[in-house]
């Protein structure tokens, strides 16, 4: 028998198994974890903006920026902490995309995560609108004299930093178990909001922008909050995975087995 004779058959079997992955109970539980964690994060994050507007009719002050940054940092840290064991604690389609670029997750599972994250964000904003007596969500908008190209660059840079932090503290096996990951991820998100909030709101998360946009039906500049984070996340995932991460030693003998699906971290 020639080596590799049945490789196409194995490849077909692996592809079929990967396509069925969303139906596996573990994948379903992971997606549910992402749904709940994203809803928790977006409810607290967007809720902090609701609260400021309810009390002061203004969210553009230094104090307001600090409140929103702290709320996002704490909510994201908590959301990552409660979901990391079940799903890896992505809570963000951009993070999932960065992990996909690094080949740490299969496309089938990534698609399942994206759907769960977007639905969780929409549910959170719907609940906020109901609980607030019909207040429209604030959502994201560009600051005075800020062009879309400026906001796009900001989102690329800020999301790059966020996803790079995810890789360094949660994905990399050298991080010592990733116990610091939720705090580090929350802190970098809060710091980025302090830096970029006055310019474009500092979303760094397509789901965070999508929920308010859908519920409030305001799509102006919305593409910026998808394209920027996805570019930044892809760059961070590629850089860390293929340059910064410790590469495994080559096996003594070639292993022709094909995995069913990429392992999530």
Swiss-Prot record:
Keywords (A to Z) from UniProt: Membrane, Repeat, Transmembrane, Transmembrane helix, Transport, Vacuole
Stored InterPro entries: Aquaporin-like, Aquaporin_transptr, MIP, MIP_CS
Database matches in Pfam families: MIP
Membrane topology category: Multi-pass membrane protein
Subcellular location: Vacuole membrane
NCBIfam families, A to Z: MIP (TIGR00861)
Protein name per the record: Probable aquaporin TIP3-2
Gene of this entry: TIP3-2
């Amino acid at each position: 028998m020639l080596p590799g004779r049945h490789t196409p058959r194995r490849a077909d079997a692996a592809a079929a198994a990967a396509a069925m992955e969303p139906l596996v109970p573990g994948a379903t539980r992971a997606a549910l974890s992402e749904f709940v964690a994203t809803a928790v994060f977006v409810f607290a994050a967007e809720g902090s903006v609701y609260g400021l507007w309810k009390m002061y009719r203004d969210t553009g002050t230094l104090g307001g920026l600090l409140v929103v940054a702290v709320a996002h940092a704490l909510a994201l840290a908590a959301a990552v902490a409660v979901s990391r064991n079940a799903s890896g604690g992505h809570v963000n389609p951009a993070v999932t995309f960065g992990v996909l670029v690094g080949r740490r997750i299969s496309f089938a599972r990534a698609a399942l995560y994206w759907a769960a994250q977007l639905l969780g964000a929409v549910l959170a904003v719907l609940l906020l609108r109901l609980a607030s007596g019909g207040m429209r969500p604030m959502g994201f908008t560009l600051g005075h004299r800020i062009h879309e190209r400026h906001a796009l660059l900001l989102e690329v840079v800020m999301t790059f930093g966020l996803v790079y932090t995810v890789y360094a503290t949660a994905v990399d096996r050298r991080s010592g178990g990733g116990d610091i990951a939720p705090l580090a991820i929350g802190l970098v998100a809060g710091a980025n909001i302090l830096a970029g909030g006055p310019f474009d709101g500092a979303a760094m998360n397509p789901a965070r922008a999508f929920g308010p946009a859908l519920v409030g039906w305001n799509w102006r500049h919305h593409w910026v909050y998808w394209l920027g984070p996805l570019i930044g996340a892809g760059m961070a995932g590629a850089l860390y995975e293929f340059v910064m991460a410790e590469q495994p030693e080559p096996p003594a003998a070639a292993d022709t087995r094909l995995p069913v699906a990429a392992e999530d971290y």
